[in-house]
Amino acid sequence: MITYAKAGVNRKLREKIKMRKFLIEENDIIVTYSDNDIGQAKKYLKVMKIYNSEKNISQMTRNIGVPRRTFYYWIKGTAPKPINCLKWLKHYHLVPFKKFDLNNYCHRILFDIYAFMFGDGSLDKTYIELSGERKNLRAIETKIHKFFPNISTNIFKTAERACSLFIYSAYLARFLIALGCPIGDKQSKEYSIPVWVIKDKRLAKRWLETFLGNEGVKIREKRRIARIEQYKLIDLENNALLFLNQIKQMLKKFNIKNNISSSRVTYTRKKDNKKIKGYYLKISRDKLNIYRLLNTLKYRYAQHKQIENDKTLRYLRKDLISHNNRFKAYNIAQYLKKNNYRKSQVKKIYNTLRLFKKGIPWKTFYSGYFLKSFTPRYYQRRDEIKKFNLKTK
């Protein structure tokens, strides 16, 4: 289902889209233009259809309601904006557009830009803006020029470490609008993630990786805090919660536990004195949950965050390997205890075992044999840890 950012696209049309084979058809691009531009496009198509068979040009232009000057512009090749947009998109096989194929490199970069629009991106009818670090934005710019060589781009420095990439393409902007990207200020707009993203696991993963690169915080070793913050007008609270619940649903596909909360404090925006509120998606700090997050999803286009995340991932992997070794030591000790091995034999068996299986801790081995109530930490979740396929010593 496509959710339109532009008001005026009625519910019946959106219901019809559910049954279609294509995400974007010609009409989806046309309806992103003004009524005047749409009217001109309709007249243009009528003129082009009957021009060659019509002998009386004056009569034809009067009947259709087109000035003679406009008619001659059209004949010479200057078409209305919607028609030019469709020609450009058809040239690059973006209309009709069936789906994003992540095996296609062009589709891949377009989908990343699409995901940016829900995070550190901004969309206007004439340009696209992406925010981030210069190195990451330069990589996107290079790919844009590779697939769309005639598009102009520019990178401006906006803060000490932050830059903005401007992509000056009204046609590509219309393509994103037709896909349902929010236009302008996201705090005061209603929008949601389309069903076709949520249902496709590969698209959901790619979308999350780009969005987390934009909005996620870097996850440090000890605190393991991972969350997403969204600020919205109080009047749009339901939409903010819907959006975060959709992200929650996608994270659930990868067994990543999270919960949603909202701030009790409201803030007043300086530009219009409207009240806004913070909404948060907090990912559980549980060690296994954070490992699963970092092992499954990479933060795209956020190199400084990913470096920190990789450190945390290495730390957690090392820690979980230690837990695995404790489980082994405990299981062996329990086996010896069950089979009535004498205490004098336990130390000898441990020393022999240590030669073949490195990393088996004596403390856990000893406690597993001598202490009745002892169980290693996370032992009840050993099957869950086993699924990570950690390389143990």
Language model features with spans:
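Internal intein/HINT superfamily modules and their associated LAGLIDADG
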Residues: 1-393
